[in-house]
């Protein structure tokens, strides 16, 4: 996901301990069943009653202090529809507390943005970190505050041990993962599939490539790739690697216990090149993909005169579909699990952790609210969001597709694999234009250079892990 990182010895051990319990595939079979079972996604139950949610709960689940006259600042990576949806959550906090909250987008390099703010003496009150490693880095520097008793109570009540552990460090709870992501989903344009005579979604990588060729032959750009944003390319690699090499190797590469020159990486890159090396299967070809940012990769799949047929990315794709296209999730836009490359289909999870950078009552109150079912249900009603909050009312989700994805996440409990690049040092796994992001962009540009890509990735990783 949009990422950044830093690693320490204790963090590495936690990634293979608590984060090993906090880093595995959601049950792919169960996910496949729930996605297959998704209907039209109209947000109604069998009686026709609206169950999609629409704002705050009828009764508040958390008590908040009065903060009249206070102005808070919250920073996160989101822009466009994701920012608009989150703003509705902030509006409810303002209504209940009397505070004013200003949202500041960080850009893709979240850690760099926040570091500059903090070192300049002007940190936001609350920030969302897209990477668990940055939480550790900031905690070591004393830049973030442990959760207060009210926020801790919400975390203890609403989140499983695995998600709690991801927000903890050296025995203290610093943050809460209030936004999760299933990053092993392929979204498809049903009209393009129908026009090409395709009635079944692919289950394996070979089937996926065959489906892409059929779509291309029928006149549809098969796969839309947002290659201008390097984080999307890391997600492609992680899904292939997890399915092909398996969870043990995945954990080892995530902690740099094996090198990027390992044969398993060669195999994954070679597999990825089966798609990335075919211009006719990519919307705009490789050059076009490298000039396409993530939001456009979604909109060009569900709008325009010649839309692409498929786009890979997480559940948050629905936010862009809902806001920027006329397509209806569950009807015009459907989804299937990332195809199995090895014995099992992968499911990679990601998320954003809310942390307090200031010690005041306002920052703690906002984190407390964000940890509540109230905030989760308001956010869920907007679409493009799933929550690891196990106590929230899943009927509040905007559409049936997202609701079933969220239920699969909750059903997995603590059994999930976390985004690999989000476990790496910031300089390798989470900064635009360098490290893994740049390495995979170069590989998309020249998919024949597997060995050269491996060498460059290993050189960048070795430097980043040594310094991190």
Regions found by a protein language model. Name each.
Residues 2-35, 39-136, 378, 452, ...:
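Conserved N-terminal structural module of periplasmic/extracytoplasmic solute-binding proteins
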Residues 60-66, 132-184:
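Hinge/lid segment of periplasmic solute-binding proteins
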Residues 247-323:
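Extracytoplasmic ligand-binding clamshell segments of periplasmic binding protein
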Residues 4, 385-386, 391, 406-461:
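C-terminal capping/gating helix-and-loop segments adjacent to ligand/active sites or protein-protein/ligand interfaces
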Residues 174-178, 184, 209-258:
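Extracytoplasmic/periplasmic solute-binding protein
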Residues 322-386:
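Extracytoplasmic/periplasmic substrate-recognition and gating elements
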Residues 64-66, 148-159, 227, 244-267, ...:
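Short, solvent-exposed loop/beta-turn-alpha elements that line the ligand-binding surface or hinge
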Residues 105-113, 132, 205-210, 286-300, ...:
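Short helix-initiation/N-cap motifs at beta->coil->alpha
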């Amino acid at each position: 996901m949009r990422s950044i990182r830093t690693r320490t010895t204790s963090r590495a051990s936690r990634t293979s301990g608590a984060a090993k319990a906090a880093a595995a595939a959601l049950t792919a079979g169960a996910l496949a069943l729930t996605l297959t079972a998704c209907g039209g996604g109209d947000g109604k139950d069998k009686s026709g009653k609206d169950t999609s949610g629409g704002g705050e709960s009828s009764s508040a689940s958390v008590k908040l202090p009065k903060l009249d006259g206070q102005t808070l600042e919250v920073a996160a990576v989101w822009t466009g529809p994701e920012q608009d949806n989150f703003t509705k959550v902030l509006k409810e906090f303002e209504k209940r507390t009397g505070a004013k909250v200003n949202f500041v987008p960080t850009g893709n390099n979240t850690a760099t943005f926040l570091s500059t703010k903090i070192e300049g003496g002007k940190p936001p009150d609350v920030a969302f970190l897209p990477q668990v490693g940055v939480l550790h880095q900031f905690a070591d520097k004393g830049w973030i505050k442990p959760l207060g008793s009210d926020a801790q109570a919400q975390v203890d009540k609403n989140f499983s041990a695995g998600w709690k552990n991801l927000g903890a460090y050296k025995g203290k709870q610093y943050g809460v993962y209030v936004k999760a992501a299933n990053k092993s989903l392929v979204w498809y344009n049903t009209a393009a599939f129908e026009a090409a005579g395709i009635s079944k979604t692919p289950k394996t990588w070979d089937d996926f490539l065959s489906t892409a060729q059929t779509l291309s032959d029928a006149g549809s750009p098969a796969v839309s790739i947002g290659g201008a944003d390097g984080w999307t390319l890391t997600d492609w690699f992680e899904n292939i690697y997890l399915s092909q090499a398996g969870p043990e190797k995945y954990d080892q590469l995530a902690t740099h216990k094996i090198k990027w020159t390992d044969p398993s990486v060669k195999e994954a890159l070679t597999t990825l090149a089966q798609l990335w090396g075919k211009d006719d299967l990519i919307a705009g070809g490789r050059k076009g993909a490298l000039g396409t940012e993530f939001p456009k990769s979604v909109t060009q799949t569900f709008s325009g005169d010649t839309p692409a047929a498929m786009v890979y990315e997480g559940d948050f794709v629905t936010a862009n579909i809902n806001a920027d296209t006329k397509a209806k999730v569950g009807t015009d836009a459907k989804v299937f699990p990332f195809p199995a490359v090895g014995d099992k289909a992968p499911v990679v999870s990601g998320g954003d952790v809310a942390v307090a950078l200031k010690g005041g009552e306002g920052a703690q109150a906002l984190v407390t609210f964000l940890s509540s079912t109230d905030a989760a249900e308001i956010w869920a009603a907007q679409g493009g969001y799933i929550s690891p909050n196990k106590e929230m009312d899943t009927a509040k989700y905007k559409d049936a597709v997202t609701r079933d994805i969220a239920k699969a996440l909750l059903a997995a409990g603590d059994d999930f694999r976390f985004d690999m690049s989000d476990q790496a040092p910031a300089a390798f796994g989470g900064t635009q234009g360098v490290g893994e992001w740049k390495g995979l962009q170069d590989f998309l540009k020249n998919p024949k250079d597997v060995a050269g890509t491996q060498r460059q990735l290993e050189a960048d990783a070795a430097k980043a892990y040594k310094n991190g």
